[in-house]
Design a protein with these regions (language model features):
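Acidic, Ala/Val/Gly-enriched low-complexity intrinsically disordered segments
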Residues: 3, 17-18
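A ubiquitous short alpha-helical element
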Residues: 18-24
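Catalytic core of pol beta-like nucleotidyltransferases
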Residues: 26-44, 49-124, 135-222
Length: 222
């Protein structure tokens, strides 16, 4: 913290100033976030790898504190606004339409859309993340097998930081003319209760098919 001239301020004012400064992102965190945002938008990296790569690119120590996701999200939105404003809205719409296709296919498992496609920061390089809430955690996998859908099982980090089984499939977007990764994260039905708690910014962190349709209705068509 910089030692600015603070003589004559009362103790309550000093305390308020310290808290205000601590809450503000420092210049280094902002620099890392801005570098990470470019990797997220231009290369489709997830935020964690993008932050670590930004640290390396900037020549910082590997253990440098990383910016929080809110700061990275702000940087991503700013980058999109500056460099992708003409293309990103149509790409986002195409991804949400593809997400809805898979949500309808997997409707019995209460699918919810999360991540960049839900929050509106996705581009054509972004994958789609759907959370399924199942009575039987194997039932979603069985459904894919029954419908002859090729998938790749993997383990990912869930929204509580725990390990979660994911079924990754390839979804074809006619609007984008590309194949998009669609990741089906399998949760217990009981997890649905806490899945809709507001995030740090007071937003609902994921939405069901009805919510996705509402987003599409609110967007201008490409």
């Amino acid at each position: 913290m910089s030692a600015g001239p603070q003589c004559g301020f009362s103790l309550p004012f000093l305390s308020h100033a310290v808290h205000r400064e601590a809450a503000m992102p420092n210049a280094l965190a902002t620099e890392i976030a801005n570098a990470a945002a470019r990797f997220v938008v231009e290369e489709g990296l997830e935020w964690g790898p993008a932050k670590r790569r930004a640290v390396r690119q900037l020549g910082l120590p590997a253990r440098s504190p990383l910016p929080d996701n809110d700061l990275v999200e702000d940087a991503v939105r700013e980058y999109i606004g500056l460099f992708c404003a003409d293309t990103q809205p149509a790409e986002l719409r195409a991804l949400r339409e593809l997400a809805l296709v898979w949500m309808e296919r997997m409707a019995e498992f209460r699918p919810h859309l999360g991540g960049a496609v839900w929050y509106g920061t996705a581009t054509r390089l972004s994958d789609i993340y759907l959370q399924l809430f199942c009575d039987d955690c194997k039932s979603a996998e069985i459904a894919l097998i029954d419908h002859h859908v090729d998938y790749e099982p993997r383990t990912v980090t869930g929204f509580h930081g725990e390990s979660v089984e994911a079924l990754s499939v390839a979804g074809r977007s006619a609007a984008l003319g590309e194949t998009i990764g669609v990741h089906l994260l399998v949760y217990d039905l009981d997890d649905l209760r806490g899945a809709l708690r507001p995030d740090a910014r007071g937003r609902v962190p994921r939405g069901d098919a009805r919510a996705v349709r509402r987003l599409l209705d609110e967007e201008p068509s490409a």
